[in-house]
UniProtKB/Swiss-Prot annotation:
CDD domains the UniProt entry points to: gram_neg_porins
Disulfide-bond pairs as recorded: none
Protein's name in the database: Outer membrane protein P2
Gene that specifies this protein: ompP2
Annotated Gene3D superfamilies: Porin (2.40.160.10)
Organism: Haemophilus influenzae
Keywords, sorted A to Z: Cell outer membrane, Ion transport, Membrane, Porin, Signal, Transmembrane, Transmembrane beta strand, Transport
The protein's role, per its UniProt record: Forms pores that allow passive diffusion of small molecules across the outer membrane.
Membrane topology, as annotated: Multi-pass membrane protein
Amino acid sequence: MKKTLAALIVGAFAASAANAAVVYNNEGTNVELGGRLSVIAEQSNSTRKDQKQQHGELRNAGSRFHIKATHNFGDGFYAQGYLETRLVSDYQSSSDNFGNIITKYAYVTLGNKGFGEVKLGRAKTISDGITSAEDKEYGVLENKEYIPKDGNSVGYTFKGIDGLVLGANYLLAQKREAYKTATATPGEVIAQVISNGVQVGAKYDANNIIAGIAYGRTNYREDLATQDKSGKKQQVNGALSTLGYRFSDLGLLVSLDSGYAKTKNYKDKHEKRYFVSPGFQYELMEDTNVYGNFKYERNSVDQGKKAREHAVLFGVDHKLHKQVLTYIEGAYARTRTNDKGKTEKTEKEKSVGVGLRVYF
């Protein structure tokens, strides 16, 4: 029997839970282990920062594992601890990108099925799941430039109404100085890193309709030691939104994502950026899906430099087994930058890859 697109999307969001193994379940306590190994063979000119030439590589593409412990108190109350890692290299010279085990998320949760939950620690924020565009590796949406999608935070999430998620987050300082230098004091927030921030958002996903919006205000520590414009970011006010509709009988989802942000700089001109991105996801046949999206993004400085980016992504994925996924994905982006008195600069990014994910 052919699966509906709604079922596929719900399954994708619950992939980690569906593939996790229950290693302990007794007297209201449940412990799960899960994760995936992911490898991609690619041709790309944007694997590393400032890369110019296109190269072929076989590398890690988000391999991870997680452990989740849930303790049920009764009457719908529960506590949960969650730890998720990544297997990545700290060195740009490591071509396969496998390396140390690092912590991606680590948090504790106290909640009630009817009243919502409070989450404390390094976790995703409400803005993480707002946009609808699908990708496996080369996502062209840079949502974190508008609103941070994770970090050290205190968050509240309410899911008491079917299909509706409401959330709010307060972000704390992400990095602090460890040593005393001529320009740094131990314990102070590192320059140009998040000092604090707030986010609120809502997403509705039911009755074939998807709608979501999030707003965030993020403050950054000024870099007093840097005299040029690179150290002047003060505050970013950003918003993200999505609107989509599922044609269940056709196995088709169409969506429109968008974002807007204004960056305030210390004693310097402000910056504005926005994007719009129509996209689709289509169930070609059982266990095979086609997806893609287009993005137009503009970034400008008051009476100054302007950059326009056009980007497109297209992919096909196929489930070989309930715990094995393979995909082909490609992305192309072109950015044109104009600055007063200077020749227009054009940059292009091209990537195509074949990936394999094995869940456990």
